[in-house]
Amino acid sequence: MTNIRKTHPLMKILNNALIDLPTPSNISSWWNFGSLLGLCLIIQILTGLFLAMHYTPDTLTAFSSVAHICRDVNYGWLIRYLHANGASMFFICLYIHIGRGLYYGSHTSQETWNIGVLLLLMVMATAFMGYVLPWGQMSFWGATVITNLLSAIPYIGTTLVEWVWGGFSIDKATLTRFFALHFILPFIITALVTVHLLFLHETGSNNPTGIPSNMEKIPFHPYYTIKDILGALLLVSVLLTLTLFAPDLLGDPDNYTPANPLNTPTHIKPEWYFLFAYAILRSIPNKLGGVLALLLSILILIFIPMLQTAKQRSMMFRPLSQLLFWILLTDLLTLTWIGGQPVEHPYIIMGQLASILYFLLILVLMPIASLIENKLLKW
């Protein structure tokens, strides 16, 4: 009798994706983050669903409904902090996943890469709207600053901002639509993840060497299921440690003050995972220029396959590209730090230099390094 997992229409799809999937035998722990992102998405959807059962998207009661969740709902505090810190874990995994893709040349699988960039944008949009929902000071002012960026668009800017707000300022209409969008986007993300995996399984996984490994592939189960379970246990351990011992470590104290349109916080800043882009936005004195730089700082990922000039797929055997990759990483960490600092003397110029270096590395230096390495191959 043929095994049901190989014949049943639904089981067959799962079998080909999770059990009998031919996988390179040498992929390292950097390949764990795809499955960890799936786990993060499941955690976020489940905790978010329970939070939505008690949350009220109204300017008068939103803040107190979050307080009610933490104080009166059974384990409400745990669900709330798992959701908030789960977002941080999501972005840590996301950035490592993208970094691994850049380092090992995963962007040569163009459809998978482009859907990945689209997923990144959607996760960022979801996280931004989620940050607005508790209706604290930073929620309100963060939403005001970011939505106001649309007004930099010539001619239609002001109309567009009012259309997003649903009025002449951020109010109940804005909060309600942000809640609705924040609720539905994760399900759209889930659908896109399926497409992302579909395209990945068309070409098969890359591996650290960047060399096709069709000669020696191994089944996904049991080898990589065990490896992924270990990664999942570590992720859950870190998330629980963060949630139970330092739930507010990555948050902003200003968000424990109810939103007040008449009182501006001394330093408006987004969550830590957006600080690098925020630093790039602030480093340009012109409003439209800043918005374009902000967009380009993320959308630059779409152009990476076109900027690829190397004959070797992976950076494993390319020391010059490796050096530039690690400089890029330190530059991003510097931008993240600067994004959290006030706009004053040393930080302004540092932010501008770090922003220039960011674009210079990706658009100019890395393609040139690849060309030099191509020349060295012929020696």
Curated annotation (Swiss-Prot):
Keyword line: Electron transport, Heme, Iron, Membrane, Metal-binding, Mitochondrion, Mitochondrion inner membrane, Respiratory chain, Transmembrane, Transmembrane helix, Transport, Ubiquinone
Which PROSITE patterns does the entry mention? Answer: CYTB_CTER, CYTB_NTER
Molecular functions (GO terms): metal ion binding; ubiquinol-cytochrome-c reductase activity
User: Cofactor binding mode, per the note?
Assistant: Binds 2 heme b groups non-covalently.
Sorted alphabetically, the Gene Ontology cellular component annotations on this record are:
mitochondrial inner membrane; respiratory chain complex III
Where does the chain bind heme b b562? Answer: H83, H182
Q: Which cofactor does it need?
A: heme b
Which Pfam families does this UniProt record tie to the protein? Cytochrom_B_C, Cytochrome_B
UniProt main location, coarse: mitochondrion
Please tell me where heme b b566 binds in this chain: H97, H196
Q: InterPro entries recorded for this chain?
A: Cyt_b/b6_C, Cyt_b/b6_C_sf, Cyt_b/b6_N, Cytb/b6-like_sf, Cytochrome_b, Cytochrome_b_C_euk/bac, Cytochrome_b_N_euk/bac, Di-haem_cyt_TM
- What family is this? Belongs to the cytochrome b family.
Annotated function:
Component of the ubiquinol-cytochrome c reductase complex (complex III or cytochrome b-c1 complex) that is part of the mitochondrial respiratory chain. The b-c1 complex mediates electron transfer from ubiquinol to cytochrome c. Contributes to the generation of a proton gradient across the mitochondrial membrane that is then used for ATP synthesis.
How is this protein named in the record? Answer: Cytochrome b
- Name the source organism: Inia geoffrensis (Amazon river dolphin)
**Gene encoding it?**
MT-CYB
